[in-house]
Amino acid sequence: EKHVIQINDTHPTLVIPELMRILLDVEGYSWNDAWNIVTHTVAYTNHTVLAEALERWPQGLIENLLPRIWQILKEIAARYQRTLEQHFHGDQSKVSKMAIIWNGEVRMANLCVCACYAVNGVSALHSEILKQDVFHDAYTMRPEQFKNVTNGVDHRRWLSQINPKLDALVKECTGGDDYLLHPEAIRGLEKYKDDQSVLSQLEAIKKENKRRFAAYV
């Protein structure tokens, strides 16, 4: 209810069975309750339809290195396959295309589509390609799952909340916190591009942030 785990492309997809493992083995949840939490917590963004973002891993690699994760993956895949066969009335062309484990491979993108409550591309065109081509059969099953979210960084979180000293300088130079709701107000900084006092403050803030980060690391 309070947190989301965002999967950016398929590289971190094993977070899905790992979260299941924690909920099952550490927290003692039943399978259904754990799966309910996972499928309301994890979301998936696909940035490109190239193979590098639609990873497939040899099942033997996962089985040997992560045996408990493999057990959980097999159960997720088996349950999902039963759902697919029921939904598509045994159409094996669609079932095989959407299967999580097939021909000795674990298909990470299909695992994301199975488990994530939201799937999005990063532009209107890209999102349409996902719906009409890459994940078309999944889209016909759960059209509400597929969304379009433009990629970007939100200044309220990544500037105001996380960098309070820079936030204070921006507010001082632009006349208050108007930029939080109207980011175009940041253009007010342009008039200080040759102001050595402001530039010195900016440099000092950057150095201090780097020192704090280095100390943390």
Where are these regions (language model features)?
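A conserved ligand/cofactor-binding region detector
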Residues: 1-217
